[in-house]
């Protein structure tokens, strides 16, 4: 999501040292130093990671993509100029920002929105050489042409029904493609529910992020939910069919920077309860998404409304 911002920063400041905080789990993706960026693991719940940052020299410029409460950290690090997006609520989050960039009044991908913190919109696109695939531990890849079905997401309200996943797998296999399932750690049970007879190979819960990148890089196609896998596929240049229920294809799709990415969004347009307009607690009138919890929404009707035929039609377009 932050790649367009990093790319624009590097173009504007070709000689600058660029440091970015990431979650510890994402750190291996930055081992090749994309755009010359130094990535540091940071967890706001871990005082040790804050101490690591406080030991650094002050920064000339700090960008705050996401929640503006992180402007306080940027200020504490001695940053000379802090830039964040405008209209964050509550207002105290933005008090330590020196510059607030207006949020777009027209539909804009979140990745392009974050890039505005680094300067005005331009026509740059992702160049694969700017982010080489990180080294990964060896594992056994499929031997023939294959497609990846990545079936988990950060919320159960984004899950698709198991029987529909199996129908997609069977249809793709009937075209002579090898089908492999994948999930993140701890979600292996999802594949067990989809394919209890284990007819298809599964990488559920066993791959780290560099390995997942390698798996995606060689795949003919990825079918996934609105999740981190869809964003990693952009780096791996994997043709992707992404299912959106509560989420917004406008916010989380390719946008301008990734416009060359082969991609199809499958969603039910104007679903009645996809009616919330908040992004990081800022209201944007053009946004249509749903951030309700499982307690508020016991069954994701927006996901259940997506049919197998629509997904397979998008798969067919990308497999031509």
Task: Spell out what each predicted region is.
Residues 1-320:
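Catalytic machinery of carbohydrate-active enzymes
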